[in-house]
Amino acid sequence: MTTAEDVAGNPYISDPRTDFESVEDVDAETAREQADQLREALRYHDYRYYVENDPVIGDRAYDALFSRLQRLESAFNLDTDGSPTQRVGGEPLDELPDVEHVARMGSIDQGGEEADVREFDSRVRNGLDGDVQYFCEPKFDGLSVEIVYEDGVYQRAATRGDGEVGEDVTENVRTISSVPQRLRGDYPDFLAVRGEVYIPRDAFTTFNRERVERGEDPFANPRNAAAGTLRQLDPSVTAERPLSIFFFGVLDASVDFESHSELHERFPEWGLRVCDRTAVVDDIDAAIDYRNEQQQARDDLDYEIDGVVIKVDDMDACDDLGSTARAPRWAFAYKFPARKEETTVRDIVVQVGRTGRLTPVALMDPVEVGGVTVSRASLHNPSLIADLGVDVGDRVRIKRAGDVIPDVVEVLDDDGDGHFEFPETCPACDSPVEHDGPMAFCTGGLTCPAQRERSVEHYASRDALDIEGVGEKAVQQLLDAGLVSDPADLYDLTVEDLTGLEGWGETSARNLVDGMDSAREPPLADFLVALGIPEVGTVTARNLAQEFGTFEAILDAADEGDTDAFEAVPDVGQTVARSIVEFFEGEGNRAVIDRLLDHVEPQAAEETDGDALDGQTFVFTGSLDGYTRGEAQELVERNDGSATSSVSGNTDYLVLGDNPGQRKQDDAAAHDVETLTEDEFEELLDDAGVL
């Protein structure tokens, strides 16, 4: 534990005097010495408050020390990296750029039944010799981030994103008081850590109340508030919100650790805040007991948890177990059951999704479920309404499935006097409703304004054409301003159109327009995904592109109603084939497609031998000019190669784009892996007959 003796002689540690002389009366040497002492003292007080939870001075004294340091640094130009004052919000950004993670931020296998966790334990013990100890910790319900320190100084932070690339939130995370700007003690030269950003419950309640008093909409739950705050473009907004963090893992470091429990002990020595509700247990029975104890305590905690994470404690054993393509074999998230509460249904409304699916939603008396006030719950489809027998005025039990989306699960009292009837026409466009099994769909296609709105967002999404700057908020702005009504309108946008909207700068506007220009010749498979054809995902779209070759051939088969031609495609059955034909038969859909074809020319799928890369393994780092990372990986995999996220002894090539990750280059050197520039990568593909 750090003590005041560690900073002996510093006058600002215990009961500090705050009646400073005027800055104008201080000479440069004295100012520099006093600023150094203040930085040291403020780091110490941050440590005592956030890590030790044992402050030695009050808030007023801390604020006085902080303010004095700010004035000294400003008056004498003494700003330094790692100063506590650097966490105050910086300049607003036009966008949050993407950044590649030091190491993959993978997900964890999870389950909510005891049988699930016992199966995990069985797999672990079958893969290891001897006894197994587990390190157990709460599963925080916040937003996971990567934070990088070099030589003990805070350098960078990023959201998890897709696990390989996240959003750069360096300046926003810098404002979080519990994130040290400089590490303490005998820290490693390089440290990339994983933490969970959250808003404490009490702070969330106060924060939401203040928003309502200002006439602003409250956040639905602490997690949404934390996520929205962390993605603010203006760090000064983030600085005013009550974010906190728990650190719980290492992604990469210049030192080794023998166990997860050792890691948990070392973090506080470096000033990194950890949760104190952890345990090392000798068997899975004790881990299950730990989980049950945390479930009992969850409502008394000042932070949201939705389960516990059980990890093999020994790091060497973790290495022996390894990982699957998506998750480590040495960890398991044992989830809590969904919370349930009672309330009364006041109305039932029907929402329209991107594919035209109609989803009934119950509007209810507000009820608190696990610290979150909810007033809406999904009823999923007309069949569920009939099965439950739910109606307006009924007393019902709801649960938060996965602690996120509320569902109505039971009618307790059906004495309500309402009588809900599922509509026969779409509430957004009055088109006839068609029933398919338990589900109901609007038949209006892209003539339906609700479907158009979702289709615009989907068209530009990462899974489709991956166009920068076209997210849910931007789409709503564009629709409200009358600038777009369907995906084709995106291609007509100008920088002048966009800079006239609130929150849009020259850079973000130019990025969107340039992104649309670069999407005028999309790969056929990506274009098919972007159209949002029901039942057609990435794999099916790729198979359709390979089988038909051109978009015109797909249109011809659809125009002829040739479901047999579609069923001949791998993974396409009767239901999917019929869905494809019906999509292209829709008049509204064809009108939008015809407009799109005025702007785009989908590129025919390249025919390849299929095994041109013959099992070679590629890793990509940095930004490529000619491909997105997904396109490059898909190109490799289509030709019998393998694309992985990390360099190992099995890697054949590391392909370097712009701003490549240094860690992957170091790993390539350690494993004697050949590196390629993008031009060399394309030469290799050309020699193999791929291009």
From Swiss-Prot:
GO terms for biological process: DNA repair; DNA replication. It comes from the Archaea. Its EC number is 6.5.1.2. NAD(+) binds at residues 59-63, 107-108, 137, 160, 196, 311, 335. Pfam families: BRCT, DNA_ligase_aden, DNA_ligase_OB, HHH_2, HHH_5. It catalyses: NAD(+) + (deoxyribonucleotide)n-3'-hydroxyl + 5'-phospho-(deoxyribonucleotide)m = (deoxyribonucleotide)n+m + AMP + beta-nicotinamide D-nucleotide. Residues 1-22, 637-667 are annotated as: Disordered. SUPFAM superfamilies: BRCT domain (SSF52113), DNA ligase/mRNA capping enzyme, catalytic domain (SSF56091), Nucleic acid-binding proteins (SSF50249), RuvA domain 2-like (SSF47781). Keywords: DNA damage, DNA repair, DNA replication, Ligase, Magnesium, Manganese, Metal-binding, NAD, Zinc. Gene3D superfamilies: 5' to 3' exonuclease, C-terminal subdomain, 6.20.10.30, BRCT domain, DNA ligase/mRNA capping enzyme, Helix hairpin bin, Nucleic acid-binding proteins. CDD domains: BRCT_DNA_ligase_like (cd17748), LIGANc (cd00114). Residues 608-691 form the BRCT domain. Its cofactor is Mg(2+); Mn(2+). It is an enzyme of class 6 (ligase). The active site is at residue 139. The keyword Transcription regulation does not apply. Residues 641-651 have a biased composition (Polar residues). GO terms for molecular function: DNA binding; DNA ligase (NAD+) activity; metal ion binding. Zn(2+) binds at residues 426, 429, 442, 448. Belongs to the NAD-dependent DNA ligase family. LigA subfamily. DNA ligase that catalyzes the formation of phosphodiester linkages between 5'-phosphoryl and 3'-hydroxyl groups in double-stranded DNA using NAD as a coenzyme and as the energy source for the reaction. It is essential for DNA replication and repair of damaged DNA. This is DNA ligase.
